[in-house]
Design a protein with these regions (language model features):
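Catalytic domains of carbohydrate-active enzymes, especially glycoside hydrolases
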Residues: 57-86, 184-188
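Substrate-binding cleft of secreted/luminal carbohydrate-active enzymes
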Residues: 263-264, 268-286, 300-375
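Aromatic-lined carbohydrate-binding/catalytic grooves of carbohydrate-active enzymes
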Residues: 70-108
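Active-site-adjacent "subsite" loops/lids of carbohydrate-active enzymes
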Residues: 29-31, 37-59, 118, 128-184
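C-terminal tail/sorting-segment detector
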Residues: 468-471, 526-551
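Pro/Thr/Ser/Gly-rich low-complexity, intrinsically disordered linker/stalk tracts
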Residues: 358-402, 454-468
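Aromatic-lined carbohydrate-recognition surfaces of secreted/lumenal glycan-active proteins
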Residues: 126-138, 191-192, 210-256, 301-305, ...
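Beta-strand-rich modules
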Residues: 436-456
Length: 551
């Protein structure tokens, strides 16, 4: 075991004592993902599309899910598009899955994958096409029947069907399938799931040969996808524990031996950009194995999957602290996090989503750049001849550039620090203009261009912007240590609820009326904030303050 683990075990002892701990400064780059499961409509869709009304209902369901994810600063959606040799899009290779129309093989009347890509990109999120590789559903199901009719090797185990990984044609087939998605859709990633031998499979070859068979599929997919669009991220979801460690056993359930998934070797060989190990475990079955993944990442991205479903009392007995401790440790290890499944996160089971919103991912984050493929920064954008216009209580910014994406930063100080994630207000923005609320105080804006690989340009920095008309004087509030003093006239007034908002109007914290005239700033990141109060006449801006570290 490397030295990192020795320090890690000492560190985790401290972490274990208290789950409610501050997460420190948020990282600017980090994968924050969810698995959006479509099999049986587990996460989506929740209704069938037979008519135009049914189509709109399905679309509305997805829009609401994505709105919640955007609000929680999730930046990656892993959408299941190959389910059981069936699809969530029109394909010349495989039939429609029945989750969308209710009838296997029948179109729902629109393209769910294309719609999801468009909606994710509108919200600054990546969409990765989740491809279930080996399972083909029931032996007599439409997916397995289609594979057999097309001459593919399908193995029957009981009533279930599986694509045979030991036949070279299987690798070619999956490679062609993924190439079709990469060619026809603006996906940001191809995500391989169940890229392993099934547990029920009687292995008649050596483990070394079995691992070579699975690696052949991975290598083929990587080659085919990168030949079409080299910026598409190829990832997989291996079993959560890679192999036995010197001090900790995997108890027979690991990627390398049980699943014949040499995923760390794929990272080292450079045929995998990201891995999402399914780490649905606790304690010593989680922490040392997470550190092992990071130690053997070879500069690629590791995003442990968290068992959010165990928070549901019908599925497990986990408490919120079981997940929050894991989130905290992953943040310290510079790893991302992914929730399985989406619904357990968006439904805020045991308060997970609200906790993540407030303490973990309060600010947006960019995903890590594909630096092993490109490191050259793109050209910076430039302001238009009239870079800003003030219209009532709105400021419209406009710029010009050649990159597919822009990242927007806002601050009360100049130049805007683009290394500080707290200044990020929009990521993967695709338009050349942005409307900001005019808060009656000068603000500063920075815009960077970003290419397909995630490389950022140098920042285009702005001048300060003055409101269009003089407003009432806003008091500067007293902030001492980690408490904000509420003015006496306010604390004695009819304000029952308070909010802290950032410089662009986003709500950072909400409070009930303080009993002693002070509002706690514990866990509030350092920065500039407005204090708002709610009376019978609505929300009122009560003052401004700057919360900073005191020596």
């Amino acid at each position: 075991m490397k030295r990192l683990l020795s320090f890690f075990f000492l560190f985790i002892t401290v972490v274990w004592v208290n789950a409610q701990m501050p997460f420190g400064l948020p990282p600017k780059r980090e994968v924050r993902a969810v698995w959006l499961t479509t099999i049986g409509g587990l996460d989506w869709p929740h209704s069938y599309a037979h008519t135009s009304q049914g189509i709109e209902k399905q679309k509305k369901e997805l829009e609401e899910i994505l709105d919640n994810l955007q609000e929680s600063n999730i930046n990656t959606v892993l959408m299941q598009v190959r389910i059981r040799a069936t699809t969530a899009f029109p394909s010349s290779m495989e039939p429609w899955d029945g989750a969308f129309s209710g009838i296997p093989g029948r179109s729902p009347g629109y393209n769910p994958l294309a719609f999801a890509i468009s909606e994710c990109h509108k919200r600054g999120m990546e969409l990765h096409a989740w491809v279930v590789v080996i399972p083909a559903g029931k032996w007599n199901g439409i997916g397995a029947r289609t594979l057999r009719a097309n001459g593919l090797p399908v193995k029957r185990i009981g009533n279930d069907a599986f694509l045979d990984p030991e036949r070279p044609i299987s690798a070619s087939y999956i490679g062609s399938f993924c190439k079709q998605i990469a060619r026809d859709y603006d996906v940001d990633g191809i995500h391989l799931d169940y890229i392993r031998y099934p547990e029920q499979w009687r292995l008649r070859v050596s483990h070394e040969q079995a691992r070579a068979n699975i690696t052949r599929i991975v290598r083929t997919v990587y080659r085919e996808v990168k030949a079409v669009k080299p910026w598409i991220k190829v990832s997989c979801a291996p079993i959560g524990k890679y192999s036995d460690l010197s001090r900790y056993s995997s108890y027979g359930w690991n990627a390398y031996t049980k699943g014949n998934q040499p995923a760390q070797q794929w990272l080292e060989e450079g045929i995998m950009d990201q891995v999402y190990p399914m780490m649905y475990f606790q304690g010593n079955q989680f922490y040392p194995f997470a550190a092992d993944w990071q130690e053997n990442s070879f500069g690629r991205t590791v995003v442990p999957g968290l068992g959010a479903y165990f928070l549901d009392p019908s599925l497990g007995s986990w408490q919120l602290g079981d997940i929050t401790r894991q989130l905290y440790v992953l943040r310290q290890l510079n790893m991302g996090h992914a929730y399985f499944r989406c619904s357990f996160f968006t439904h805020n089971v045991k308060g997970l989503r609200l906790y993540a919103n407030d303490f973990v991912d309060a600010y947006p984050a960019l995903t890590p750049a594909l630096t092993w493929q490109s490191t050259e920064p793109p050209h910076s954008p430039a302001w238009t001849e009239k870079p800003h216009e003030v219209n009532g209580n709105r400021i419209m910014m406009s710029w010009k550039g050649t990159t597919p994406y822009y990242n927007i930063y806002v601050s009360c100080s100049s130049p805007v620090d683009i290394a500080d994630a707290r200044n990020l207000v929009a990521v993967r923005y695709t338009r050349n203009e942005l409307i900001l609320p005019d808060k009656g105080q000068p603000i500063y804006v920075a815009v960077t261009g970003m290419d397909r690989y995630g490389n950022e340009s140098k920042a285009l920095q702005s001048m300060d912007y003055v409101p269009s008309q003089e407003g009432p004087t806003v008091p500067l509030l007293l902030c001492k240590a980690d408490e904000l003093k509420v003015p006496q006239c306010v604390s004695e007034g009819d304000f029952k609820y308070f909010q802290l908002r950032n410089v662009v109007g986003g709500v950072v914290r909400s409070y009930i009326k303080p009993s002693k005239g002070y509002i706690s700033l514990a866990y509030v990141p350092y920065g500039a904030y407005w204090l708002y109060g709610l009376s019978k006449k609505g929300w009122h801006r009560l003052g401004v303050f700057y919360y900073k570290k005191t020596l």
